[in-house]
């Protein structure tokens, strides 16, 4: 029997511990993902969802807990080393690519993901350019004709689509999507969401996706988990996930409020964010 694609066990982290600004971000969070599964993480600002993603990606080392990928303990691996087995798309389209390099050069860098201080030493061969053009052409954005265009000249949607391709160019054991449509306009968001679903389903990538969008949580993925105050408070999968509606998610947050886990102002913020 193969190991789970991801095991995050007992993740606990506190920012500014022992100071007046102390903030408990994660409280003994457990998350296990099977290969090819797609989990969507939903929660308000401060719920711990981004801290969870950062702990898995290696952007921060949790105070306690273990992270295993395909059975390997990566808890204390540096972020660049984890990038050999993880692909990540950030909220800001400019974060996952290098603006002054061309489309082709960015893809060439992505092909070296996980190698310490990977650099471009040789120009791309003609065959290499053709291969990159074919891969970029699959996005359907016309970027195959703009391989020599600096990435900084692309629109936010084009750049985020390219970053998604870069994150999956070398097959990752785990794909991390960190609110990757939050900075896009509605049209670009729809386009990138469609590309995301196509790439993940076609490639069978194990995916952990953080979002603020209830609509995305309903329509994407195999399981949605709700986070609040550093805990996973609900996990919805299987037939219930397939039949899930936005109204049911709203009801879940209302139940949290009535249980005195979310105050009235936070509940109102959730409605403004998610509807």
Question: Predicted segment positions?
Answer:
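ABC ATPase C-loop
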Residues: 167-168
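Conserved beta-strand-loop-alpha-helix hinge in the C-terminal portion
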Residues: 231-257
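Conserved ABC transporter NBD signature motif
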Residues: 65-73, 234-236
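H-loop/switch region of ABC-family ATPase nucleotide-binding domains
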Residues: 211-212
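ABC ATPase NBD coupling module
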Residues: 19, 73-87, 95, 118-121, ...
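A short, flexible loop at the N-terminus of ABC-type nucleotide-binding domains that lies
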Residues: 2-5, 14-28, 78
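Helix-to-loop junction immediately C-terminal to a conserved catalytic motif
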Residues: 57
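The feature captures the beta-strand-to-loop junction immediately N-terminal to the Walker
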Residues: 42-44
